[in-house]
């Protein structure tokens, strides 16, 4: 779960406070991945979980700098979480700042930490740094064998990434398209490469959802909004499945009021 992964991340970082430990370099490596280019000898930190719903808040002692981590396993950011948490950090009371060991005008860095598959929605997240499952695995692997906790999490992460790789390789098992959003995303991007997508535009962005437990995937290829009206139309591809397997359909959507005779 994400709360368990929060605990692992904090566990890794807290070794910075024990410079004699053989896992001290792990904390340094992870901080560098989070954007701390220089980690000085003697630097310490404080990690706080669920601080005003922020997954992890890392307070760097004596730096007046904090790192805000939004941690995900398989879900994606929703409701502009990072933006809201960033704004909340600028509104702390004097007592709250004291508890975090920071002052006014604190320097804030945001990290989007996701070990699951990165969908298009994840690529739009407004964070200073993004850390993927592959990047975290690369950071942890050199320290394998130095802790049972670390080894257990490494086994979990390796299996998770292997499963994602299998789902992407749907050509070996085409039936994965029926029940895997990762497989559907991969096929949609094979047909419509990411180079067609301009970040921030709905056109050629891959969307995902589910219906009765089955994943579906959509991509808008044309959109028109009438200048003098609130409505318009969209043309999009939809990948879905039924009893016969996975299919791709071209659809037209007009958001008119079906109960209004004039709009019909």
Where are these predicted regions, by residue range?
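Polyanion-binding interface signature
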Residues: 170-264
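Short, aromatic/basic amphipathic alpha-helical patches
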Residues: 27, 121-129, 260-264
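Active-site-adjacent loop/helix micro-motif of nuclease/hydrolase catalytic cores
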Residues: 75-84, 258-262
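Gly/Pro-rich interdomain helix-loop hinge
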Residues: 80, 84, 90-213
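Conserved catalytic cores of phosphodiester-cleaving nucleases, focusing on short active-site segments
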Residues: 9, 56-58, 65-73, 85
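A structured, charge-rich N-terminal accessory region that forms the first stable segment of a protein
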Residues: 1-33
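Short, flexible loop/turn elements at secondary-structure junctions
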Residues: 60-62, 72-75, 89, 114-117, ...
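Active-site metal-binding core of divalent-cation-utilizing nuclease and nuclease-like domains
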Residues: 29-62, 208-231
